[in-house]
Regions:
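Conserved GNAT acetyl-CoA-binding A-motif
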Residues: 120-130
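Glycine-rich phosphate/pyrophosphate-binding loop shared by adenosine-nucleotide-utilizing enzymes
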Residues: 12, 73-76, 164
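Conserved acetyl-CoA-binding loop-helix of GNAT-fold acetyltransferases
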Residues: 103-117, 139-144
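Conserved active-site tyrosine of GNAT-family acetyltransferases
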Residues: 142, 147, 169
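Conserved catalytic-core motifs of GNAT/GCN5-like acyltransferases
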Residues: 128-131, 148-164
């Protein structure tokens, strides 16, 4: 299956989702070990419902599959949903469907790539997410990526015979760009106010600067 290196990290890249991926996603979304952690255990997912979901959300969603660079294997998905162009916010969704790739840092890398895409290219200001209170690994990962807890809805999800809280978290553009800008500033030998201004506020770089090459510690977008 053909994938495209839209956003490239150290071990993974994000590619636009193909319609051919539906069968694999349907298998993942019928596994309670996956759906319990994303709050979708009560849903009955078929090939038809997954195809309908994909066509419906594509209008206001940036959805990517997570592909390993080493062997070009699809291991999960990450997305920015409910993108609000006026208020510049969106909701992040992610899951690693392939169990062999969980707890190995692939999710955190995918989150950093999608955040950089959302803040740097979509000009978003606030990105939020929700998770179940028992998903301690995800909570630790989100905090590591810069998300802050901003509230919880008590006992709103019924999973496997018990009610659980849903935790809400978010991150602002300026909170994410702290480390992002530091990495890039250390790479400049000289810097002008214009370049700094464009980097901080994520505005398009004027034509005069389009030939500037910036060497960073991260792989470039391709």
């Amino acid at each position: 299956m053909k994938y495209f290196k839209k956003l490239v990290g150290e071990r993974i890249y994000l590619s636009p989702r193909n319609s051919e991926d539906v069968e694999q996603f349907t298998e993942w979304l019928n596994d309670f070990n996956t759906t319990d952690y994303i709050g979708r255990s009560g849903a009955s997912v078929t090939l038809d419902t997954e195809k309908e979901y994909l066509s419906r959300v594509s209008k206001d969603t940036a959805t990517f599959v997570i592909i390993t660079l080493e062997d070009n294997k699809m291991i999960g998905t990450v997305s920015l949903e409910q993108i609000d162009d006026i208020n510049r916010n969106a909701t992040l969704g992610i899951f690693i469907g392939d169990k062999d790739y969980r707890d190995n840092g692939y999710g955190a890398e995918a989150i950093r790539l999608i955040l950089e895409y959302g803040f740097r290219y979509l000009n978003l200001h606030n990105i939020k997410l929700d998770l179940m209170e028992f998903n301690e690994r995800a909570l630790k990962c989100y905090k590591k990526c810069g998300f802050q807890e901003n509230g919880r809805r008590r006992k709103c999800k019924f999973i496997n015979g018990k009610y659980y809280d849903s935790i809400s978290m978010d991150i602002l553009a300026e909170e994410f760009t702290g480390d992002f800008i530091k990495i890039r500033l250390l790479s400049f030998v000289t810097i002008t106010f214009d370049i700094l201004f464009c980097s901080v506020f994520f505005r398009p770089v004027p034509p005069a600067f389009t030939t500037i090459s910036v060497v960073t510690s991260r792989p470039p977008f391709t």
